[in-house]
Amino acid sequence: INDPDKYVVVQTAPAVRAALGEEFGYEMGTNVEGKMAAALRRIGFDKVFDTNFAADLTIMEEATELVERVTKGGKLPMITSCSPGWIKYCEHYFPDMTENLSSCKSPMQMFGATAKTYYAEKMGIDPKDMVVVAVMPCTAKKFEIGRDDQNAAGVPDVDISITTRELARLIKRCGIKFDTLADEQFDQPLGIGTGAAVIFGATGGVMEAALRTAVKMITGSEAGDINFTDVRGVAGIKEASYKVGDLDVKVAVASGTANAAELLKKVQNGEADYTFIETMGCP
């Protein structure tokens, strides 16, 4: 941040704004998005962006890939790829199923790739001089940014990943009085997002957002008459079947690697025939 030759931007995951307030005496779950954006500017970031922007990109890409696999005979079931802890687990314990993983990057990495290609070009900034910092609820994100395949612009998509608690410590270390800050907005254009992006952070949210988008792509109409509540909630494994146009789509959502492993073993043994599986490494 103090290097005048670096253009430093920050992105924040949707879960962070609902957890950060606890570090400053707010009730659990309080949305402190506005104060968080203000604090990040006081720290010295050049731009303050929202990972929800990239979550929407991920949803569109993942839904497109799902529709293509279903209609053109691609590898099924397709498995979500936004959880780095799950990806690493799959690579180690289910290497024969890595082709089932979606080709989409996680929202964090997709944001970094967009920032260092599209946004850097628009701003006239060399990607090598841009530093992308991500504030995430997941420590596995620190591993994800170092993967060899996460460098769309020839440099790491994301340079630094910190947790919600680490951000809180940084705010306190900078002497910022969090509760006195006036609410501020994210910067544009990488600071906008939809409700679909917000639910991305909850188990079942990726599935619901992608399915709603896929319904629109296949039928040309909104999914208003399709109830996706079966994939929500805190159960370790959730299953549901939906009629999407002329297609029968069977889906499953696994919370935690133990439940994900149970699902994949069923697929390997021919005991289950899913179209789409969402997995999150965290329980």
What is the role of each PLM region?
Residues 1-283:
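Iron-sulfur-associated redox domains of electron-transfer enzymes in respiratory
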